[in-house]
Design a protein with these regions (language model features):
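Catalytic cores of enzymes
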Residues: 1-208
Length: 208
């Protein structure tokens, strides 16, 4: 059964470190290889019978290098807009996402001030211009994964003259997003190519 296998995996992967884990409230996991496909939070502590997520707050990091860099970052004091969202971009190559539009509209009501761009206004150019000023950046658009070249994986926005609307990993890495909380409400944003020493190169990795 699922629970039996979840307990076996817990014992194989985490039991040896149980003494250290028991002292911590937060657990940061840096998976390797096929372990990126494993939701550690669903493992079951064979002693307590509880899911790991019930006992600890679980976080993931793509590599130790990225984790170290994140820990050394300082918090900036810039004036940032509370909430910036993009949803339901208009494209011929993907289906519309009307529920994503409602999603960001409802969340935007909880923030003041907020700026929400949908359909034809949800452009790549506007993301690049507005995102550096956002405290919370919420992107509810289609994602496109390139397994051959992970730097060409992209979030899909509304195209306009001289702009294909594909915000690639390479482009995201060049953006300045000081201390922003980024929410990727898209399919496959945590999928990508696992490289030795670098970890998982994905759309979510690009925002770290």
């Amino acid at each position: 059964t699922f629970k039996t296998e979840a307990k076996k995996l817990y014992d194989s992967l985490l039991k040896a470190a149980e003494g250290e884990i028991s002292k911590a409230k937060h657990l940061i996991i840096v998976p390797d290889g096929a372990l990126w496909e494993l939701p550690f939070q669903a493992l079951i502590n064979s002693a307590s019978g509880k899911y790991l997520v019930e006992e600890r707050e679980i976080f993931y990091a793509p590599s130790l290098g990225v984790l170290s860099a994140l820990k050394s970052q300082t918090v900036s004091k810039t004036n940032q807009r509370n909430f910036l969202a993009f949803a339901n971009s208009t494209r011929k190559d993907v289906a519309p996402l009307p529920e994503a539009e409602r999603e960001v509209t409802d969340i935007g009501k909880l923030y003041a001030p907020s700026s929400i761009f949908v359909k034809t206004t949800a452009t790549e150019k506007r993301v690049k211009t507005e995102a550096p000023n956002a405290k919370v950046l919420h992107l509810a658009v289609h994602g496109e994964i390139n397994q051959t070249d992970p730097f060409e994986s992209a979030l899909l926005f509304t195209p306009e003259a001289g702009d294909d609307g594909r915000l690639t990993v390479s482009e995201i890495l060049q953006m300045n997003l000081p201390d922003s909380l980024v929410v990727l409400s898209s399919c496959d944003t945590s999928n990508g190519q696992v490289l030795s020493g670098e970890g998982l190169l994905s759309l979510s990795w690009a925002f770290l």
